[in-house]
Amino acid sequence: MEWDNGTGQALGLPPTTCVYRENFKQLLLPPVYSAVLAAGLPLNICVITQICTSRRALTRTAVYTLNLALADLLYACSLPLLIYNYAQGDHWPFGDFACRLVRFLFYANLHGSILFLTCISFQRYLGICHPLAPWHKRGGRRAAWLVCVAVWLAVTTQCLPTAIFAATGIQRNRTVCYDLSPPALATHYMPYGMALTVIGFLLPFAALLACYCLLACRLCRQDGPAEPVAQERRGKAARMAVVVAAAFAISFLPFHITKTAYLAVRSTPGVPCTVLEAFAAAYKGTRPFASANSVLDPILFYFTQKKFRRRPHELLQKLTAKWQRQGR
């Protein structure tokens, strides 16, 4: 990333002499984003289709999963623009509005996924640790939909400043789309970026870990022989805990650690350009991990939902039988 000095001077801020060499983005991001698009688009469409065709058996967890898949699908639809941008050497020809929209969709998907995974985890905790309590069963699916509306409103409110800070600029006689903000606004973006990390990641992550720690304690206390149904339920809860924790660790933790470090360094006066470039490379190098949640989420869905895992096999068997009959 390089800062056009004219941008800083137009804003009344001192110019910078740092020039980032980020050729690695042209090599790393297009193939990674292409893989995420190729896998995430059909997988999330399949999840949405399967849940929508099972509306009578729609549970609260399925409602949260449906909204999670919608968030992933919206992000996947924005990837072609980013693939073209980085394949052309970080050249953005799509205009300022598209730049702001793409950056907003990335962070909306990121923090929407975090919140919906937290909702799924909390629902699993209630189902295992308080299965007979009437207070968490009131409202049924309607309550789950209200929670989803609240999540979307919260995500939009949290991420809307991203669309305000993101902008296009001129570097080396080409138009670029800034990710966080133009470097001239680094100190202005810093408080918002840190608040977004705390509210949009750390607090939900802490809530999710608390849910699964309590759930693990409950499962460990259930000693002695159990019925097959109970054993299957415990196994499902354990699988969910491991997979969700892994999804968080792979997708979200490296990205937020490097992003926080980069925000702190680039907002500190007098930091050498080589240090700034190193932190920028570390942050942007973990961006594919954050994008991978669009693929990990539907895999998580199929891994933990046995009845939905059976459907693709049943459909494949029906198609195979149909082709065999036609071939006779």
Swiss-Prot record:
InterPro entries xref list: GPCR_Rhodpsn, GPCR_Rhodpsn_7TM, P2Y6_rcpt
Q: Keyword Transmembrane on this protein?
A: yes
Topological domains on the Extracellular side lie at 1-27, 84-101, 166-194, 258-280
Q: Which domain of life is it from?
A: Eukaryota
Sorted keywords for this record are: Cell membrane, Disulfide bond, G-protein coupled receptor, Glycoprotein, Membrane, Receptor, Transducer, Transmembrane, Transmembrane helix
Question: Which GO-annotated molecular functions does the record name?
Answer: G protein-coupled ADP receptor activity; G protein-coupled receptor activity; G protein-coupled UDP receptor activity; G protein-coupled UTP receptor activity
Q: Can you cite a GO biological process for this protein?
A: cellular response to pyrimidine ribonucleotide
Q: Is Cell membrane one of the keywords UniProt gives this record?
A: yes
| Transmembrane domains' residue ranges | 28-48, 63-83, 102-122, 145-165, 195-215, 237-257, 281-303
Any single GO CC term annotated in Swiss-Prot or TrEMBL for this entry? plasma membrane
Where is this chain glycosylated? Answer: 5
Identify the CDD domains for this entry: 7tmA_P2Y6
Q: Which residues lie on this side of the membrane: Cytoplasmic?
A: 49-62, 123-144, 216-236, 304-328
Which is a Pfam family this sequence falls into? 7tm_1
The SS bond pairs are 99-177
Topology relative to the membrane:
Multi-pass membrane protein
Which cell locations does it reside in? Answer: Cell membrane
Q: Give the function comment from the record.
A: Receptor for extracellular UDP > UTP > ATP. The activity of this receptor is mediated by G proteins which activate a phosphatidylinositol-calcium second messenger system.
- Record's family? Belongs to the G-protein coupled receptor 1 family.
List the protein's name.
P2Y purinoceptor 6
- Lineage, top ranks: Eukaryota, Metazoa, Chordata, Craniata, Vertebrata
